[in-house]
């Protein structure tokens, strides 16, 4: 790892945010009831979306809750790029059903909507009140996040992205209190993801890792996570797209996206996400694809200031850089990103 502390955070205090407990592996979703009970939850609101319902994943989870004789309520109307209206509707269900905890089931949209409910349940007001950094004052209800995609890492982050329907912008809420208490990444729940979604979420994870790695807030801890994430994405994403039933590839991508989440949750993101969020908020475009399309262009822009880092990215992504100058090696990273994107079928542009 090529980290020069003198050029980073020597002498400064840094922080590292992750869930209290994380479960990864085939069948770990069966532990939802026991984990929820261990943190004080008795009747959760399950926040999910129609895609999860139609795929039969919600029934898989409710069967687990039923077997444990755990009561629950369901909000299944979350949309891609969840809105302030989604949060308000879900919170009404939470109150009406007298829930005391939250289980989010899905990808980034369901997790973000559920986090929004957590803000209102713990602190009151409207979701708009929490736009910005660490605006909440009181704890969340007990919260278990169950992931079904390998990309957003929302099941383990302190980020909550909600579309403000009046302004047509995505509100960025960054708050350590919305970090789930328990994160669950069960590759069994990801087997049915179609190739296009697998590709988009996987490239979202790569974007997280790359942006965190070249961030001015990067630390040795985030570097370690970002490097391993990029290595695993390069090893497993093509396989997961080609064969969704490839258990090793699915589990590899579980780890990859989680590691990328650990990186960006603590080193933050960059211009790719800044632009992708606005495309999602204004045009309702899919987040993962926007990131994948923008990543090579923003990386080329950033490359001139971080050549050595991009040279390292090139090597992690399988490029041979022996004998090349720092500039030449850094260009190989852009080529590797483009190749991976093309290999998994990401569109070449936004049109």
Residue spans of the language-model regions?
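N-terminal small/polar loop signature for handling phosphorylated ligands or for N-terminal nucleophile
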Residues: 53-126, 239-250
């Amino acid at each position: 790892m090529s980290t020069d502390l003198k050029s980073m955070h020597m002498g400064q205090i840094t922080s590292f945010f992750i869930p209290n407990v994380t479960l990864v592996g085939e069948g770990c979703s069966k532990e939802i009831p026991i984990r929820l009970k261990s943190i004080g939850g008795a009747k959760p609101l399950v926040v999910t979306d129609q895609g999860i319902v139609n795929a039969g994943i919600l029934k898989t989870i409710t069967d687990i809750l039923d077997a444990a004789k755990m009561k629950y309520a369901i909000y299944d109307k979350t949309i891609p790029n969840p809105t302030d209206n989604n949060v308000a509707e879900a919170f009404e269900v939470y109150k009406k059903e007298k829930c005391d905890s939250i289980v989010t089931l899905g990808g980034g949209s369901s997790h973000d909507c559920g986090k929004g409910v957590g803000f209102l349940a713990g602190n009151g007001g409207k979701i708009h009140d929490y736009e910005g950094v660490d605006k909440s004052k009181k704890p969340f209800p007990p919260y278990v996040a169950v992931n079904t995609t390998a990309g957003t890492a929302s099941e383990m982050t302190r980020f909550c992205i909600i579309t403000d329907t009046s302004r047509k912008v995505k509100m960025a809420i960054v708050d350590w209190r919305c970090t789930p208490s328990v994160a669950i990444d069960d590759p069994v729940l990801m087997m049915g993801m179609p190739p296009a979604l697998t590709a988009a979420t996987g490239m979202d994870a790569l974007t997280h890792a790359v942006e965190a790695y070249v961030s001015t807030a990067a630390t040795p801890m985030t570097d370690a996570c970002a490097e391993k994430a990029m290595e695993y994405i390069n090893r497993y994403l093509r396989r997961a797209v080609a064969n969704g039933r490839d258990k090793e590839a699915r589990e590899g991508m579980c780890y990859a996206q989680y590691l990328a989440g650990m990186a960006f949750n603590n080193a933050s993101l960059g211009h790719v996400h800044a632009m992708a969020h606005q495309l999602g908020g204004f045009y309702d475009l899919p987040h993962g694809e926007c990131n994948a399309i923008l990543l090579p262009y923003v990386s080329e822009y950033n490359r001139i200031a971080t050549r050595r880092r991009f040279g390292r990215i090139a090597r992690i992504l399988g490029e041979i850089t022996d004998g090349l100058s720092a500039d030449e090696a850094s260009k190989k990273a852009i080529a590797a990103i483009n190749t991976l994107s093309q290999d998994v079928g990401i569109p070449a542009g936004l049109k």
